[in-house]
Amino acid sequence: MESEELFYPEISVAIGSYALQKGVEVEVYSDQNSYFDWAKIRFTPQFQENISVKKKEPGTVMLGYNRVLDTVFEGYVTGPYSGGGYMDEIVLKDKMLLLEETIISNTFLDVTPQEIISYCLAQAGVTETKLSAEIYQPRSVVSIAQKNVIAVIKEINTIWGIKNKFFFSGGIFYWGEKPEQEKIYNFEYGVNII
């Protein structure tokens, strides 16, 4: 078995047109009980005045070793950031931000949960999805008035008595499904971790 020392990871951050490997500190948060995953990127003073990004510009955080980096977060800038201010960080949220900002008002007839969710995701511009294949009894009428997509999915779960979790992973939206784990890391105390 091959062993690598994994003491000090390399960091690469891309936000809008910027790519940074130094002068940044990264905090990434993911929790199955939270709809959003988020990342905070903090800058040293030398970068604070020179960086300017708009709301919803894409951002990526990558970590790794020996110039082999894995993407640990992909998302969008939550608010504009302009150099010269007192802020020293940019907050990114995952694609759930698109669902939060997309408002749905529609009446659905003879519909299943998957059909409503597919419609809502299309309205938000989300194309890659994995929805539960479980068969649910269609409802004759479901009316949605001025709700964001997150609230619509919560309402769907209530109407049908479903407890399906929903989230993004690797840019794909999951509802009642789970992504397959591609890599398994083996950490050994004193060998590759302290």
Predicted regions and their residues:
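Second-shell loop/turn segments in exported
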Residues: 102-110, 140-143
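Short, charged, solvent-exposed linker or helix-capping segments at domain edges/interfaces
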Residues: 101-105, 185-188
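Glycine-rich, acidic and aromatic/proline-enriched surface loops and short helix-turn segments
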Residues: 80-86, 112-129
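Assembly/oligomerization scaffold segments
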Residues: 1-98
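Extracytoplasmic/secreted envelope proteins and their assembly/folding machinery
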Residues: 74, 114-118, 150-154
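Short beta-strand-centered interaction patches in the first periplasmic/extracellular domains
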Residues: 1-2, 87-96, 130-194
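Short, well-ordered alpha-helical packing segments
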Residues: 78, 121, 153-157
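Short capping/connector residues at structural and topological boundaries
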Residues: 31-33, 104, 192
